[in-house]
Amino acid sequence: MKHLLLFCSILTTLFEIIGNGTVAVAKTPLRVMSSNIRFNSEQDLGDTSWDARKQPYVNMIRDTKPDVIGMQEPRDAQYADLERLLPEYDRFRLLPNNQITRKQAASGMILWLKERFQCLDSGYFWLGPTPNEPCLPWDATDKYHYRMAIWVKLLDNISGKEVYFFSTHLPYDPGNRPDCFDADGKRIRNIEQRTKCAKLIVS
């Protein structure tokens, strides 16, 4: 039976630009994926339900074997399923707490292969006027969907180098996105200044 997969994924192998401007495959290639898996809505029935989609999605990850994955829109039940079905990956997500509601925490997760990476640091910020505190995007007409970026700093056990990976969830309204891109870039530059030798990946 064919399943309709309600997610959008981009998988790429990173390349390095060597001194003469030639693009070459890195000595230790890094395969990264960004994927909006769509939340498990009760309105999604049959082949569009998460129960029908989750195994094909996991199979795709197993087939492509990305080293790092940025995910948007997973909910609690989906987190639990992916943790159970993908035990070879470690993960970072923002959990609700006394200061951050479930809605404000949005929904995002970064996964990385346990055997290849160690997580040295992690963080998050909202794509809005107060990035350190829960906020909606600038001039948002949608008052329900918070948008944010989460990130991890990983140590690559193969190359010995550090890698920053950012997973960004942009708003629906295209008019809000330029400000979000600008905010994303500024925050990333501030974080990246901590080290000049790290690779930096934004999804």
Where are these regions (language model features)?
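Positively charged n-region of N-terminal signal peptides that target proteins for export
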Residues: 1-4
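Bacterial N-terminal signal peptides
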Residues: 7-19
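N-terminal, active-site-proximal structural segment of metallo-dependent hydrolase catalytic domains
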Residues: 15, 22-85, 99-105, 198-199
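Acidic/histidine-rich helix-loop elements
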Residues: 34-55, 99-100, 128-144, 171-193
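Structured beta-strand-rich core segments of catalytic domains in phosphoester-bond hydrolases
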Residues: 72-172
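His/acidic metal-ligating clusters that form di-metal
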Residues: 146-168, 179-203
